[in-house]
Amino acid sequence: MPEYETFDNALPKEILLHSGGPVLFVPHIFRGAFNPKRIGICWDGSRLAARALRDARPFVAQADSLVAISINGADGVPAYASTDRLVKHLARAGLPISSVDITASRSEIQTTILSLAADESVDMLVMGGYGHSRLHEGLLGGVTRAMLQTMTVPTLMTH
């Protein structure tokens, strides 16, 4: 029988994959009231990132500031899904957004995002989860799994 007392197991993955909607994961170290006023949007131009942003709309609308986080310039993203396009779209809607592009190797993505979240005093992250096949995630690991194991800030994920 698997151990389900921590998020360091299969339960969060199964919840995310089968919930049919967004899941707000709150790290065990989180204390205080949940009032996300500074939101980090992990953006790679994917369908999952767009869906996560759409699912976070109630939080985004109430935020004091948003920061779009892209890794390595979101390599290979078409212009219509770029971080610049996202920033312009949200700014047109009157939302207070900035962007940060960070460079990281595949194995450092999750720690780099969490470090940036701390630097920017982010109250919540928004991201897609498990965007690669189960085989790919199983063989190479994944940002989602690493994030679930080490998150330091509440994170809204969508699959």
Task: Locate predicted features.
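Intrinsically disordered or low-complexity boundary/linker segments at protein termini
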Residues: M1-I69, T150-H159
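Residue-level marker of alpha-helix boundaries and capping positions
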Residues: P2-E3, V77, A104
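A short, flexible beta-alpha/helix-coil linker loop
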Residues: E3, N72-A74, G131-S133
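Charged helix-capping and loop-helix junction motifs
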Residues: N9-L11, A81-D84, L114, L139-T144
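Alpha-helical scaffolding segments of alpha/beta enzyme cores, especially the outer helices
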Residues: E14, P58, R85-K88, S115, ...
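Short, well-ordered secondary-structure micro-motifs
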Residues: P36-K37, A52, V77-S82, Q110-T112, ...
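Redox- and metal-dependent alpha/beta enzyme cores, enriched for Fe-S-associated oxidoreductases
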Residues: G45-P96, V100
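Structural beta-alpha unit
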Residues: R92-L125, G129-H136, R145, V153
